[in-house]
Structure formats: structure tokens, C-alpha cells
Amino acid sequence: MFSKISSILQQAVEALAPSLPLQEDFVYHWKAITHYYIETSDDKAPVTDTNIPSHLEQMLDILVQEENERESGETGPCMEYLLHHKVLETLYTLGKADCPPGMKQQVLIFYTKLLGRIRQPLLPHINVHRPVQKLIRLCGEVLANPTENEEIQFLCIVCAKLKQDPYLVNFFLENKSKGAQSGGYIFPGGSAQHELLNDTGQPERTVGANADPGNESSSGDLKPSASSEASANHIQQDYNLVNSLLNLTKSPDGRIAVKACEGLMLLVSLPEVAAAKCLTQSTSLCQLLTDRLTSLYQALPHSIDPLDIETVEGINWGLDSYSVKEDASAFPGKRALISFLSWFDYCDQLIKEAHRIAASAMARSVRERFLVGIMEPQLLQTSEIGILTATALLHRIVRQVTSKSLLEQIVYFILGEHRDPETLRDVHKTPLRHRLIEHCNHISDEISIMTLRLFEHLLHKPNEHILYNLVLRNLEERNYTEYKPPCPEDKDIVENGQIPGAVDLEEDPIFTGMSPENTLSKEWLSASPPITPEHHRTDGKTEVHKIVNSFLCLVPDEAKSSYQVEGTGYDTYLRDAHRQFREYCAICLRWDWPGAAKAIDKCNLEAPFFEGHFLKVLFDRMGRILDQPYDVNLQVTSVLSKLSLFPHPHIHEFLLDPYVNLAPGCRSLFSVIVRVVGDLMVRIQRIPEFTPKLLLVRKRLLGLEPDGPMVDHMTLLEGVIVLEEFCKELAAIAFVKYHSSSTP
């Protein structure tokens, strides 16, 4: 009670007293603090019952006023006094002792405001960065500490200052041996009062405001980036700023944890190599990321509806305020799922912002400790429910990832790092890759669809290894083709408008009677270049109208139904194909792909051809399109159309060129569809009223007809509809790609 009255009286006296010069006023307030420790005998009274908070606030106001009255960069006498008399060192000692109780909180507030409100750079001064470093060590020591809020504010202002001047981070990398020796700055007596009694007020060695931090060899701190990078590799270092933030990420107070995560985000982005190495080699940052991912993943229910995993929203690591009571669409495990995906989002953003050295190390840690150690066994299990949930979670991760380094490690986890052509005996090299590809052909349609969607989203990611590993490495030598040297009479055939060696599909019995609605219009054909004698098949650019019409007339007329429904024509696919092709071209822009196929004379055509496990499964699935569920067919054709969009000449030739000379035993997408059509023509003859039933099913699928009695051969009819639409889509893709390549 009496201390509060004395505090009020003291403030009144200060307000009425004549103003002193700033330096005298500053020294007065500092001496008032030191005299408290000399004169008081009650060190258990809380600091809020003393004048110390008021004096500290006055000192800060004086420093700010002094800076405002001087030219930019000029150090005034009050700041000189603070630096030379080691005021911050003394305050650190008082804060560490927490004498009187609550002093640590006041010291943290003073440091935070000093660094935040003073514009001139303070951290280069030895008598600033050294006590700041010591105070950092006190932060995060105890979770749920009453000073947690002040601790995180202080740490974040230090991080912000380092973000402004990244080279300063070298002051905060301590040699472990030296850091242990330099612990506290308390005199042998051990009390805070003892240190103050030994402070004679005489200035020690002067450190100018613009002192070169690189010359402070006597401070025991690491020199700035001028120090050799090699030394950083041999000296074990402490990064206490990171360690304190890591401790505070575990705070039960969500706001504190988020602020700590923000501080780490600032630190990982610093461009200093030594800091990046220390971050990953001498701190537990990588372990924290993966351990929390693991614990959150293991907290998920064993079974979650894949649709819930796909559609859950509100995933943002900094906004985690989910309330079950307010969520009308809550499902079992939603809280745990959001927590897991939010932390993955944080890992992704952290790696995205990080220095490349730190990013690479953190991404590898996520792969080794979480993906391989935790997720892989879940993906390889035999329980269908477990496989479905694990695949859906992996699919969500693939969709969500944005950082280049983490994406690369996820790709290596799923596909492996091999780039040699595949063989049938390669299964043991990458068991997870093989198992996931097998799951595309799983007995469970749900697992097949989910795994196909995983690969579809994987193909849309900006990573060259994905497509090369799955497809391109097997097409590199073009040994799916059979080279036939042109005969002398080929020139005459070309001049007559035909292509040597090509099958004239328009004269094939399968393709006779093509209706006008299925042919390419004259406007679209106008983009095709004129046929020239130099235009051979082997250049991969067979005339676009022949290619397009080849796909459009694949399905016989009696198996077509789109022309009887408005708005389902071929032209509807052109717009989508054009948009998607531009997107894929943007993805592949930096991959340095060739503009033309590899010359036949440079290809090893004698090597045995294997299309690869991925294309094998897709082609096998495509071959069963008439006997598979509608949803499976949609997903299979979706993946194949995405593959066809890639602007690589070998992919275009293998998937979109009907006229390619296939080597014996090889198949292309077109040849697979031809076999399906042949089977379809036989089966049509056995189904009475096939065309009316087909039209009815199409209208039901489009919602133009209400559901009624079950139609016989429903799976076959739905498969025919998907087949027709897929052929139109491939025709549109072929046209768009050719038009793009022929446009100057």
C-alpha cells in the first residue's frame, strides 16, 4: 500500500519538477532503479509495486525523443550512456534473477520496445547483441510461463530485425563451448545487488554506433559472414533463437504457438549460409516438424470418408479456430484432420520460404521420418479401408503441397529416383511405386479411383521427374516404332495427298458411313498446312485433319448418341483442350523438352520395348472400358487425356498418332481403342434396341431424363458413352496441339 502511494507521489514530483537535459534525466531514472536495489531490503514485493516500470518507460521515452531530435544515424549521449554502461547487461541480470518478482517481464518489455521503437541499428553493438542473446536463452524455458506473451513478443522483434539486416544473424550463432563458458554475467557473490554495487558508473571500452561487428573479436561471439564457411562446418554451434522459438511452438496457448511459428518463418528465410546450416544441423527444427506431423497423423481415425478428406476446408496453419458446435458439416475426426493438414501446410510454407540449404534438409527429413517411416506402411497394408484412407490422405498432401523442395521429396517417395527405362523385373526397386500403380487396377473400385486421382494430380505438379519416371523414360528410344525405309513410289503417293505407309482409316470397314456431324468443319481444317513431298510420317506431324477424323470416326454410328443431344458436340472439347494445353505448356516451360522427336537413325530400335507399368495398367484398364463401372472409366480416360496434353513429341506420337508404325508386340492408345471398338461391334449385334437404350442412358447421365427402370447392359452402355466422349476429347487435344505447333 505504502509503495503504491510513494510511486504516485514520485510521478507527481517528476511532473512538477523543471525539465532536465535529456542525458541527466536519463541517468536520473537509471540511478533510481539501481538505488532501489541498494536501499530496499524487501525483494519479495512484486515489481508492479515499485517505481521500476515507470522509470524504464521514462528511459525509453527519452531515447526515442533523443533520436527524433537528431539527424538519422547519429547516436545521442543517452544512447551512448546505455551502451557504455552496459545497462542492458544489468537489466538482463535482474531479469534472470526475477528480482523483484515480475522483473523478467519488465525487462522483456523494455528490450522489445527498445528494439522496436529505435530506428538506428542497435544489434551490431556488442553491449546490445550480447545481452539480447543471453535474454533469448531465458525464453521458452518453462511452458505456460506467466511471461510467455512478453517472451514471444521479444523473440519476434529480434527475428524482424534479423530479417531487415540478415548478416546480423551471425551474432546469434554461438560456439557451444564458448556459449557454455559465457553463461551469466553475475559476480561471484551471486546476487544482483552485488553486481550493481560493483558498477562504479565509469564507462568501459567505447563502442561507436557504427562499429564494425566483424572486428569485435574480444566479445567471444561469432564474427559476421566474413568468417569462412569452412569453419561453420567444423565448429558445433548453438542457435538459441531458434531453440527458444521451438520451445514456444509447444505452448498450450495457441496464439503463442502461432507467433513462434511466424518467428521461425522469418529465420529460415535468411540468406546467410552459416545460419541455414546451423538451423538444420544444430537445432531440433527438422525433428519438431516431423514429430508433430507424425503425432497428428497417428491421431487420425483409422477410417475417414475420402470425400471428407478431399473437401474439408479452412486449412491454414495460422488460423486454427475450429469449433465443432458451429460446424454443421462436422464428421468424426474432422478436428484431427484439420490439425494434421494445417501443420502440413505450415511445413510446406516453411520449406517454401526457407534458404535452399535449410529447405532441402527439412524436406528430406519429412520424407525420411514421416513419409517413409509412417505413411509408407499404411499405403502397403492389406486392409482395404486402411489403404483407401491412406491413399486419400496422400492425395490430399499432393494436392496441397506448393514448395519445390517438399514436392520433390514427395515425388521421390512415391515414384523413386530411377530414370532408366523400366523392365518387368524392376518391381523390387521401388515397391511403393509398383504397389500404387497396381492399386490403379485394384479389385476395389474405390481404391482404383482414388489412386488414379492421386496420379492425375501428381501429373499436374511442376516437377519434371514425375512424367519422365512414369512415361518418358520408356519412350526415349522410340523403340515402339518399326522403321520402314520409304520406297521410290512413295514420292508419287505423297504428291497425290496420301502418306506413305499410313492406313487409310476412311476406307477401313470400321469407319465407313461416317456421319457429317462427326467430321471436322472447314473452318477448323483451314489451320492445317498444305501437304508437301517433304512431309513424311516420321516427323510426327501427320496431317491434323486425318488424325482428328481418325479419332472421331473410331466409334461406329450405331454406337454414337451425342449428336442426338444438344450441346455435346466435338467443339465443346476444343475450348477445354486449348485452356488445359496452355496450362501444361506453362508447367513444362523450363524442362527443356525437344521440339521434335528423336531422329530414327539415332534411336535404338533393337532394344526390347516395355511401355512401363503405369501405361500398362492404363492401357489394360482402357481395354476393359466396356466392362468397368462408369466412375472408373471416367477416371481412367481423365488420366490418359492429361497425359496426351503434355507437349512432348514422343508422348504425342505414342498416344495421339494413329498412323505410327508399331513394332511387333507393341500397342499404342489408338490401337487399344481400335480393339475395344472391334469388340463393341460384335457385342452390339447381340443387344436388341441398342441405339434407343444408349440414348436413354446418355440422357439419364446428363439429368435430362428421370431415373426409371433398370436398363439391361447398363455397364456396357455407359462404357460406350465414355468411349465416344473420350475419342472426341482426344481429337480436340490433337487438333489444339498441332495448331499450337504450326502457329509461328
From Swiss-Prot:
Biased composition (Polar residues): 215-229
InterPro entries assigned: FHIP (IPR019384), FHIP_C (IPR045669), FHIP_KELAA_motif (IPR045668)
Pfam family, one: DUF5917
Annotated segments matching region Disordered: 197-229
Entry similarity comment: Belongs to the FHIP family.
Function: May be required for proper functioning of the nervous system.
The protein's name: FHF complex subunit HOOK interacting protein 2A
This protein's encoding gene: fhip2a
